[in-house]
Curated annotation (Swiss-Prot):
<dbReference type="GO" id="GO:0016787">
    <property type="term" value="F:hydrolase activity"/>
</dbReference>
<keyword id="KW-0378">Hydrolase</keyword>
<protein>
    <recommendedName>
        <fullName>uncharacterized protein 037R</fullName>
    </recommendedName>
</protein>
<dbReference type="InterPro" id="IPR004274">
    <property type="entry name" value="FCP1_dom"/>
</dbReference>
<dbReference type="InterPro" id="IPR023214">
    <property type="entry name" value="HAD_sf"/>
</dbReference>
<dbReference type="InterPro" id="IPR036412">
    <property type="entry name" value="HAD-like_sf"/>
</dbReference>
<dbReference type="Pfam" id="PF03031">
    <property type="entry name" value="NIF"/>
</dbReference>
<dbReference type="InterPro" id="IPR050365">
    <property type="entry name" value="TIM50"/>
</dbReference>
<feature type="domain" description="FCP1 homology">
    <location>
        <begin position="1"/>
        <end position="199"/>
    </location>
</feature>
């Protein structure tokens, strides 16, 4: 079965490096795509305001709880146990694709950082590929020249509830990942197992048709 995975708040959570005080003239002092393990501190650019500095420190402390990759303009936090989830989908024979509301350049960076190509990732659908501001509906895929797949054998995983409402038998809602203290490895493992089980139900229905 084909599965389309959302990126932000589904697989990852990212913030602009500017929120930690860095700018193009003073870029984040780590090479893009450097992977930082959970527990390693983030670099913060100090400003002139104590309130701003305190806010940046709090943000850095929160993000340091998660495995991260430094992109060109963002710091990307990995959803805990994400690799186990992706390994499971691949081992079960799912064809992995990505559908994101983000821009193509940003999405390409995330795909590279997560090494989704190693899972045989097929399609990358970004903001430019479907009606602006609309809910992700699988039927839009039929209008893309690159998409030659039966929608009856397709599912989508997304954190936005309206995506699930738009196609209740083909979508799996996932709790948004916001890189908060509530996103523990245990809770995220349970959530991703639930998503995997929901996909298996959809796949089972597809096989019986």
């Amino acid at each position: 079965m084909q599965v389309f995975l959302d990126l932000d708040e589904t697989l990852i959570h990212s913030i602009p490096v500017s929120r930690l005080g860095w700018t193009k003239s003073k870029p984040y002092p780590v090479k893009p795509f450097t992977v930082q393990d959970a527990g390693t501190p983030l670099s913060v650019m100090m400003g002139s305001s104590k309130a701003v500095n305190d806010g940046r420190k709090r943000l850095a402390t929160r993000l340091s709880l998660f495995k991260r990759t430094v992109l060109t303009d963002h710091i990307m936090c990995w959803r805990p146990t994400l690799r186990t989830f992706l390994n499971g989908l691949f081992a079960s024979g799912y064809k992995i694709n990505v559908w994101t509301a983000a821009s193509k350049p940003y999405a390409l960076e995330v795909v590279k950082a997560l090494n989704l190509k190693s899972y045989g990732m097929g399609l990358l659908v970004t903001a430019q590929d479907y009606p602006k501001g609309s809910v992700k509906r699988l039927k839009y895929l039929t209008g893309l020249d690159a998409v030659k797949i039966p929608l009856s054998n397709t599912a989508i995983v997304d954190d936005r509830e309206e995506v699930k409402r738009a196609q209740p038998t083909r979508a799996v809602h996932i709790k948004p990942f916001t890189a908060s203290s509530a996103n523990t490895a245990c809770s995220e493992s349970d959530e991703l197992k639930r998503v995997t089980a929901s996909l298996a139900i959809i796949a089972g229905r597809s096989r019986r048709r």
